[in-house]
Amino acid sequence: MIIGHGIDLQEISAVEKAYKRQPRFAQKVLTQKEFDIFEAYKGKRQISYLAGRWSAKEAFAKAMGTGIGNLSFQDIEVLSDEKGKPFINRSPFTGKAWISISHSGDFVQSSVILEEEK
């Protein structure tokens, strides 16, 4: 049974500005595994990755019904499988979490559906 659905739309350039103002922004948003991947990217791909993880975590918090204020960005880890499909590797939710991250131009959109396991 679906118990939550969260959607987030994020302007990539806004995340880039935040990162340029405060480079530790990436370490606040990303887990260590995510940060290692982030550091392997360069330029626009690096910022796009950071914005995607930010958006995904915001969408997850909305699906939980709590907003990010009651969660830490470190509580949620979003990785990708060998084909590039994102998945939630770690979170406080014990059921199944479905995630989609889409980039287009200066925007990234994420959708998270939380499903209670029977």
From Swiss-Prot:
Q: Mainly resides where?
A: cytoplasm
Where do the annotations place Mg(2+) binding?
A: 8, 58
Family according to the record = Belongs to the P-Pant transferase superfamily. AcpS family.
Per the record, what is one GO cellular component?
cytoplasm
Where in or outside the cell? Cytoplasm
Keywords in alphabetical order: Cytoplasm, Fatty acid biosynthesis, Fatty acid metabolism, Lipid biosynthesis, Lipid metabolism, Magnesium, Metal-binding, Transferase
Protein name, per record? Holo-[acyl-carrier-protein] synthase
Which species is the source of this protein?
Answer: Streptococcus uberis (strain ATCC BAA-854 / 0140J)
Give the reaction(s) catalysed. apo-[ACP] + CoA = holo-[ACP] + adenosine 3',5'-bisphosphate + H(+)
| One Pfam family named in its UniProt record | ACPS
Q: Which GO terms describe its biological process?
A: fatty acid biosynthetic process
Q: What is its EC number?
A: 2.7.8.7
The cofactor named in the record is: Mg(2+)
Class in the EC hierarchy, top level: transferase
**Which function does this protein serve?**
Transfers the 4'-phosphopantetheine moiety from coenzyme A to a Ser of acyl-carrier-protein.
**Molecular function, one GO term:** holo-[acyl-carrier-protein] synthase activity
